[in-house]
Swiss-Prot record:
Catalyzes the reversible reaction in which hydroxymethyl group from 5,10-methylenetetrahydrofolate is transferred onto alpha-ketoisovalerate to form ketopantoate. The lineage of its organism: Bacteria, Pseudomonadati, Pseudomonadota, Alphaproteobacteria, Rhodobacterales. Homodecamer; pentamer of dimers. GO terms for biological process: pantothenate biosynthetic process. It comes from the Bacteria. SUPFAM superfamilies: Phosphoenolpyruvate/pyruvate domain (SSF51621). It catalyses: 3-methyl-2-oxobutanoate + (6R)-5,10-methylene-5,6,7,8-tetrahydrofolate + H2O = 2-dehydropantoate + (6S)-5,6,7,8-tetrahydrofolate. One of its GO terms (cellular component) is cytoplasm. Its EC number is 2.1.2.11. This is 3-methyl-2-oxobutanoate hydroxymethyltransferase. It comes from Ruegeria sp. (strain TM1040) (Silicibacter sp.).
Amino acid sequence: MSASSQKTALTAEDIRAMKGRTPIVSLTAYTTPMAQLMDEHCDFVLVGDSVGMVLHGLPSTLGVTMEMMILHGAAVARGLKRAMMVIDMPFGSYEQSPAQAFANAARLMAETGAAAVKLEGGEEMADTIRFLVKRGIPVMAHIGLTPQSINTLGGYKVQGRDDAAKPLIADARAVAEAGAFAVVLEKVPASLADQVTEIVDIPTIGIGASAGCDGQVLVVDDMLGFFGAFKPKFVKRYAELGPAAEEAIADYASEVRARRFPSAEHTFADHAPQKAPQQD
């Protein structure tokens, strides 16, 4: 199954059914035009809280608000027809209690059209995941490196090495048993990601994990090369659009200052051009 073979939007059950089959494809999106480009190629599109860093210049995801997620989620939804849309729950919107999580998840889905929410955390979030799923909200879990916990993790470090492997496996089991339809594994050793993929009965979505995961996700601006200095080890650059865009902007500025733009082909005459007479 792939997004391009579906005539209607994929659902959480469709994604779950892809476990162990054709790898699941996902990217982040924050705008309508980018979502339109992805729709034919991605199985699900993630409206990530990475939007705070990518589009708003924040130093981390911690400053992202519900309002920001709703704004960008609604924009992405307008660009999708086939791919499923999953939206991140921002920091502080779900950790306090399952009831808080339900209220905010329901709002995100109602105001954006998202088909599921994603939240970070393992065993400690299992009760919340179970609470949401029982009330009709599909949940994608996220374990390993969880960016919203960056202050307690001590940086963007690889998670699950050595003695930390068992707790991560326990996290994966807990979120699967709680009813999550998929789980993101971020920045964990490849062998551990493969082990988790074998253990749990839901799809694993890798980002800095392993090709053996059931699917992959990347931040689209990273893989398109918009940020020159920022290049994590797990990101493959499929294009270098940042330098190309800067070159185009520099050319435009040069032509404006030299009065070469706009040229005659980009301006309008005093009178509309005459239509050629029709031939009998």
